Amino acid sequence: MSMMDMPIKEMEAYLGSSIKPNDFDNFWDREINSITEENLKYRMVKKEFKNKQSEYYEIYFNGIDGAEIYAKYICPSSKKKFPIVLEFHDYKEASKGWYHLSRYVAIGYSVVAMDCRGQGGKSQDIGGIKGSTVCGHVINGLDGELKDMYYRKVYLDAYILSRIIEKFEKTDISKIISFGKGQGAALALVVAALNKNINKCSLQYPFLVDFKRVWDMDLDVNAYEGIRYYFRWFDPMHIREKEVFEKLAYIDIVNF
C-alpha cells in the first residue's frame, strides 16, 4: 500500500487511528503517582576528565522495576543554575558521547542523556516478562499485564530521571527541555506530558506513534517489525487483533 494514501488536506486534519483507552489518563496518573522519594534516589560519579568550562558525571538510579539505569550528565563549571536539556537517543542506540554532548555547555546549558534499558548503552534490563522478545521491543511484554510492557518501563525510567534532574544543584527548574529523535522523540514527548516542570519539548521524526496506522499501511517493518512477527506467530487468524492494539494504545504517543 502507498505510504501517501490520503490527500494532504486530510493529513493536515488527521489525529491518528489509535483509539485512546478510556482509562488512559488515569492509568498514567496512577503510574507517576506511584513514584516515591525512594525511586528518586541516585548516585552521581564525577569523571576524572574535565575542562575549564565543563564538569562531567555519570548518573545511576533504579528504574521502576529495580533495573539499574545509566545516564551522562554535563554541566557548566560556574556555580549557578542553568537551563538543562534532557536528551534521549534513537532506537537500538545509546546516549551520545561526552564530546558530542559537550556542545550544550558551549551555549550555556547543562545536559542529561539516558541510556534506554537493554539497548546499546549501559542501562540494565532485568527481563522477567511473559511472551516473545524477538523482533523488537514494541511487543516486549505484550502477552503479560500492562505493567510488563517494555515501553511502560522505559517511559517511567525517563520520567524518574526528569524528576531526579530537578534536584541537581545547578538545574534552573524553570528551564527544563526534553529533546530526542525517533525513539528519543517519543520519550521526550512522554516526559513532557507527564512532568509539568518540563516547559519546552523538541521532537524529530518520532517513533512509537499510531501503531494501528502503521499496520493498516503495511509499514510494520524495521523498528515496527515486531507487530507483523507477533501476528504471524501468535495470532495468525487475528482473533486478538483488537485486544493487541488496545494494549499498544497505552504506549502510543499519539494518546499523550
Q: Each PLM stretch: what is its role?
A:
Residues 242-256:
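Serine-hydrolase catalytic core
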